[in-house]
């Protein structure tokens, strides 16, 4: 099996980003640009992944974390792409091939890279190229007019006027045979307008050495677009999100507007899922059959089962939602919550770290925290489970078939027994008996001849 090494060039300063954050750490679809490149590289199961870092390098390494499968090589001076790859030479195998990727080209797909790798072997070279209507700024692919074979790559700054008319450009992504790589890199020169060591100069060397050069192209141009400023980053963000939306629509998802939708992780959908505008999905989100997500909702690490509806302006995170539930509008479901089947959570309700059993309803203006709630419970408007004493959290247990009247407070730790009714306006501090009405109110009185205070007119 052919050994594949990967070199990722991530040492650039990114001046045009106008940011103290290294360019490769700017987020796209919820994760740093470099993470996209690393994730794609890992899909290829390479022998080694070598990251060339420079500007802000320690922060880059810290953000990526301790991955024993990554080799980090520092490029102290940014002297060009050829110089950058040369820094990785001690880490690369003597045989096999090396795939060169760029830390600021985040959206190239693994299938595109697999096709490129298939074109290469231990004694040939493969380039990823693309034809652009406006190729300005890119190196041009120079081909033999008779054989159509690649002869060289000429950078924009060094190209002749006739060469600048060529629309086929070099993306920078290439597969190189390791057996030639050291010799080629040693022969690079910086005698050009930029004074840099261009990796692309090895193409002419390969031609002179009789090495066959193959080319491959991506399915979409935006796969090979790099990020140099915030405008390009924004453009790639939308291209990525529309590509994700297209894939979901091909699976049957219905969008109110696929242009107003963001996935910052992974979204898996069942049949007949409907997603309204301005919804954001973060982490791992799974939606079952016939689920409807209304406008302006945020879902983070959520599993929602068949037939459930999330109404507008709701936020759900780290939660499991059962079948045929109703959540919102304006509901907040916080981490550690499980809603069983047919649970209703209404407007301006917050639930945290709680289990709500099937058929229960919390419809209005309530806070339920650290609670184990049984089946068929009805929580009146303005109910608060008082779970925090200033130092520790305590649990509230509400058993099956309980009715809690409006504007009630349950002071945890407490158990409201099966079938209990809590009268409206009560503050409950002790466990309640099963099947009884429990109240805690002062006696209502009316004061005759009482006059409301009035302001002086002085």
From Swiss-Prot:
Name the Gene Ontology biological process terms: cell morphogenesis; cell wall organization; lipid A biosynthetic process; peptidoglycan biosynthetic process; regulation of cell shape; UDP-N-acetylglucosamine biosynthetic process
What are the start and end residues of every segment in region (Linker)?
Answer: 231-251
Q: Where does Mg(2+) bind?
A: 104, 228
One Gene Ontology cellular component:
membrane
The UniProt record gives the binding positions of UDP-N-acetyl-alpha-D-glucosamine as: 9-12, 23, 75, 80-81, 139, 155, 170, 228, 334, 352, 367, 378
User: What are this entry's molecular-function GO terms?
Assistant: glucosamine-1-phosphate N-acetyltransferase activity; magnesium ion binding; UDP-N-acetylglucosamine diphosphorylase activity
Location within or outside the cell: Cytoplasm
- The catalytic residues are 364
* Keywords, in A-Z order: Acyltransferase, Cell shape, Cell wall biogenesis/degradation, Cytoplasm, Magnesium, Metal-binding, Multifunctional enzyme, Nucleotidyltransferase, Peptidoglycan synthesis, Repeat, Transferase
Q: Which domain of life is it from?
A: Bacteria
Pathway assigned in UniProt = Nucleotide-sugar biosynthesis; UDP-N-acetyl-alpha-D-glucosamine biosynthesis; N-acetyl-alpha-D-glucosamine 1-phosphate from alpha-D-glucosamine 6-phosphate (route II): step 2/2; Nucleotide-sugar biosynthesis; UDP-N-acetyl-alpha-D-glucosamine biosynthesis; UDP-N-acetyl-alpha-D-glucosamine from N-acetyl-alpha-D-glucosamine 1-phosphate: step 1/1; Bacterial outer membrane biogenesis; LPS lipid A biosynthesis
InterPro entries given for it?
Bifunctional_GlmU, GlmU-like, GlmU_C_LbH, Hexapep, MobA-like_NTP_Trfase, Nucleotide-diphossugar_trans, Trimer_LpxA-like_sf
**A Pfam family that the UniProt record links to this protein:** Hexapep
Q: Which cofactor does it need?
A: Mg(2+)
Q: Which residues cross the membrane?
A: none
List the EC numbers from the record: 2.7.7.23, 2.3.1.157
Q: Where is this region: N-acetyltransferase?
A: 252-458
According to UniProt, the reaction catalysed is: alpha-D-glucosamine 1-phosphate + acetyl-CoA = N-acetyl-alpha-D-glucosamine 1-phosphate + CoA + H(+); N-acetyl-alpha-D-glucosamine 1-phosphate + UTP + H(+) = UDP-N-acetyl-alpha-D-glucosamine + diphosphate
Q: What is its main location?
A: cytoplasm
Q: Which residues form the signal peptide?
A: none
Binding note for cofactor? Binds 1 Mg(2+) ion per subunit.
Which parts of this chain are annotated as the region Pyrophosphorylase? 1-230
**Its biological function?**
Catalyzes the last two sequential reactions in the de novo biosynthetic pathway for UDP-N-acetylglucosamine (UDP-GlcNAc). The C-terminal domain catalyzes the transfer of acetyl group from acetyl coenzyme A to glucosamine-1-phosphate (GlcN-1-P) to produce N-acetylglucosamine-1-phosphate (GlcNAc-1-P), which is converted into UDP-GlcNAc by the transfer of uridine 5-monophosphate (from uridine 5-triphosphate), a reaction catalyzed by the N-terminal domain.
Q: Give the multimer and partner information.
A: Homotrimer.
Q: Which family does it belong to?
A: In the N-terminal section; belongs to the N-acetylglucosamine-1-phosphate uridyltransferase family.
Q: What is this protein called?
A: Bifunctional protein GlmU
Question: What is the species of this protein?
Answer: Nitrosomonas eutropha (strain DSM 101675 / C91 / Nm57)
């Amino acid at each position: 099996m052919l050994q594949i090494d990967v070199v990722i060039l991530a040492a650039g300063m990114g001046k045009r980003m106008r940011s103290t954050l290294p360019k490769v750490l700017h987020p796209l679809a919820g994760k740093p640009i470099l993470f996209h490149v690393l994730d794609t590289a890992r899909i290829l199961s390479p022998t080694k992944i070598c990251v060339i870092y420079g500007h802000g390098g320690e922060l880059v390494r810290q953000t990526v974390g301790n991955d024993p499968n990554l080799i980090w090589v520092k490029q102290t001076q940014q002297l060009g792409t050829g110089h950058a790859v040369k820094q990785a030479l001690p880490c690369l195998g003597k045989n096999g091939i090396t795939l060169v990727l760029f830390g600021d080209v985040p959206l190239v797909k693994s299938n595109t890279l697999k096709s490129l790798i298939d074109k290469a072997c231990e004694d040939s070279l493969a380039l990823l190229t693309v034809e652009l209507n406006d190729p300005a700024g890119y190196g041009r692919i120079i081909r033999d007019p008779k054989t159509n074979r690649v002869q060289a790559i000429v950078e924009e700054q060094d190209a002749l006027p006739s060469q600048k008319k060529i629309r086929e450009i070099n993306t920078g992504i290439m597969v190189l045979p390791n057996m030639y790589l050291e010799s080629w890199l040693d022969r690079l020169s910086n005698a050009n307008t930029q004074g840099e060591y261009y990796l692309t100069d090895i193409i002419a060397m390969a031609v002179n050495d009789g090495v066959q050069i193959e080319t491959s192209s991506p399915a979409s141009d935006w796969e090979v677009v790099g990020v140099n400023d915030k405008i390009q980053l924004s453009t790639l963000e939308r291209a990525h999100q529309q590509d994700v939306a297209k894939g979901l629509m091909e699976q049957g998802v219905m969008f109110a507007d696929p242009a107003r939708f963001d996935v910052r992780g992974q979204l898996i959908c069942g049949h007949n899922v409907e997603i309204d505008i301005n919804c954001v999905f973060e982490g791992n989100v799974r939606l079952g059959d016939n689920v409807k997500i209304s406008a302006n909702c945020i879902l983070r690490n959520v599993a929602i089962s068949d037939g459930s509806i999330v109404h507008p302006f709701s936020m759900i995170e780290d939660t499991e939602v059962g079948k045929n539930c109703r959540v919102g509008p304006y509901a907040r479901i916080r981490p550690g919550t499980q809603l069983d089947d047919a649970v209703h959570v209404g407007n301006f309700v917050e639930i945290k770290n709680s289990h709500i059993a099937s058929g229960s309803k919390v419809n209005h203006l309530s806070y339920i925290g650290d609670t184990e709630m049984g089946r068929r419970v009805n929580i009146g408007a303005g109910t608060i489970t008082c779970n925090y004493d200033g130092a520790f959290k305590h649990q509230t247990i509400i058993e099956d078939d309980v009715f809690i009247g409006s504007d009630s407070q349950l002071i945890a730790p407490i158990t409201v027994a099966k079938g209990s009714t809590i009268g409206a306006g009560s503050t409950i501090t002790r466990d309640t008996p099963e099947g009884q009405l429990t109240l805690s109110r002062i006696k209502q009185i009316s004061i005759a001849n009482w006059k409301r205070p009035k302001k002086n007119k002085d």
